[in-house]
Structures are given as structure tokens and as C-alpha cells.
UniProtKB/Swiss-Prot annotation:
Monomer. Its cofactor is Zn(2+). A zinc finger (FPG-type) spans 234-268. It comes from Syntrophomonas wolfei subsp. wolfei (strain DSM 2245B / Goettingen). This is Formamidopyrimidine-DNA glycosylase. Its EC number is 3.2.2.23, 4.2.99.18.
Length: 268
């Protein structure tokens, strides 16, 4: 699933070419449209002024105050293509025809993602937790979030209502960087461990953005290029390989229904 760094990378790709005028919004599969606050025709002739991100959502702001909000689900791609390209790959469900002979395509084979046409985003995003790369996300905030929680720290990091944008890959990587086992009870972390985890989260996300995200199979950026952070992963997807710190074989276990990768020696 595309996580914060992957969506941030696509956002950055789009920001490079905006603003662009919408010529037509083409919905090729109705069930991919999760919410429609306004008619499609209201977008015709309007200008996409800005791309932004909230958690794992990508937001396109239109000059008449409307918003197009995308979530890429498990396998979604959002990329720019020249208008002259007439052959479409399978599972392209949304096409935004733009000026400058361009079009923006949303492709999603598994259809866990979608598009929301919204007049306001404040209510839509009101339940999302803090952005981990923001100044507001600090050790004090993380300490408040962890206080009294008996769940595994890995599960807490994946809770989008508490921290927005972190998924399985970056939770494992941040916990390894902080030296914390993914199955540790959240409330058991010391102040020093919380500080280390906060730094680890910010560092691993920033590094992944630098390398344009992680590609194992589906993910491509807004230019249809794979990310490169998979070449820099320390633990995720490296079961039974040597720990980069101590050399012991890395472990894998199921926590909250998801695979977690860690070092039994380096993480306590």
C-alpha cells in the first residue's frame, strides 16, 4: 500500500506541472467514486491550482473552491501522461483531461482506493491523527498518545486516527531505528525510547521521500517511475537475512494481522 512517502512523492511530481486547467473529468468505473458533493460538470474549465497531502490521501485543490481527493488503496497509481497516448493500461478508472496536452490517470487493479469529490475537506480529515513530519508531532504528543495503551506499539503506529500516513513498511523501519520491538506494549516505553521513536519515524519517512518511496510491485510515482527506498530498507521484507547492526537473522511475526520484521537482539 502506498504510504506517506509514496503519496508525498506523487504530490511533488504534480506540483511541478501545476496549475493546469481541467478540460474533462472522465469516470470509467462508477464504484471508484466514493463521494460526490458536486456535479462533474462543475470542474470543466476550472484550474487545478495545488496538490497537497493529508496522511495517505492526495488532494487536488481547484480554483472554484472544490476538491478532488484520491486514496491509492493497496495498488493504486496516479500519474501524468501525454494526451496523445491513446492506448490505456488495464484498470484505469479515472482520467482527468487537462490543458497543455496532458491527462492525469488513476489506475487501481484491486480497487481498494477511490476518488472523493468534495466541497470541503475539513470534516473529511477531522478524524486523522497528526502528520508525523509536522512540528506538532513531537515526543510530548507521542507520549500522550501512548499513555495507558495496552496494545502493541506497532498497532498504535498504524492507527490513522492517532498518527496519519504510517503503514507497515515504515512502522517496522522506525521501530528498528529506535531499537523497540514491534510487540512491545505501547504504555511501557520510556521517555528516552519515545524520543528515539519520534526521531526514527521522522528520519525514515524523510529518507524514503528522498528516494521517491518504496516499490516492490505496484507503486509508481507521478511520472510512472519506481521508487528506490526498497534498496535502503533495514528490516522490512528481509526475514532471515542478517541484521545490518549485529548480523543475526531477522525475525518475522504476525502482529495485528500483519507481518512484522525485527531483530530479536537489537530491539527490546
Amino acid at each position: 500500500m502506498p504510504e506517506l512517502p509514496e503519496v508525498e512523492t506523487i504530490k511533488n511530481n504534480l506540483q511541478e506541472i501545476l496549475p493546469l486547467r481541467i478540460k474533462e473529468l472522465e469516470i470509467r468505473r462508477e464504484d471508484i467514486l466514493r463521494c460526490r458533493d458536486y456535479a462533474l460538470e462543475e470542474l470543466t474549465g476550472q484550474i487545478i491550482e495545488e496538490a497537497s497531502r493529508r496522511g495517505k490521501y492526495l488532494i487536488l485543490a481547484v480554483d472554484n473552491g472544490l476538491f478532488l481527493v484520491f486514496h491509492l488503496g493497496m495498488s493504486g497509481r496516479l500519474y501524468i501522461q501525454e494526451e496523445e497516448t491513446t492506448v490505456l493500461e488495464p484498470h484505469v478508472h479515472v482520467i482527468i483531461h487537462l490543458d497543455k496536452r496532458l491527462k492525469l490517470l488513476y489506475q487501481d487493479a484491486r480497487r481498494f482506493g477511490g476518488l472523493w469529490l468534495l466541497k470541503d475537506t475539513q470534516c473529511f480529515f477531522s478524524r486523522l491523527g497528526k502528520e508525523p513530519l509536522s512540528e506538532e508531532f513531537c515526543p510530548r504528543y507521542l507520549e500522550q498518545v501512548l499513555q495507558g495503551r495496552q496494545t502493541a506499539i506497532k498497532n498504535l503506529l498504524l492507527n490513522q486516527n492517532l498518527i496519519s500516513g504510517i503503514g507497515n513498511i515504515y512502522a517496522d523501519e522506525a521501530l528498528f531505528m529506535a531499537g523497540i520491538r514491534p510487540d512491545r506494549q505501547a504504555a511501557s516505553l520510556s521517555v528516552r525510547e519515545i524520543e528515539g521513536l519520534c526521531c526514527g519515524i521522522k528520519e525514515v519517512l524523510a529518507k524514503s521521500i528522498k528516494y521517491r518511496g518504496t516499490t516492490f510491485r505496484d507503486y509508481r510515482d507521478g511520472k510512472r517511475q519506481p521508487g528506490e527506498f526498497q534498496n535502503h530498507l533495514q528490516v522490512y521484507g528481509r526475514f532471515n537475512q542478517a541484521c545490518p547492526n549485529c548480523g543475526q537473522p531477522l525475525k518475522r511475526s504476525r502482529i495485528g494481522g500483519r507481518s512484522s520484521h525485527y531483530c530479536e537482539k537489537c530491539q527490546q
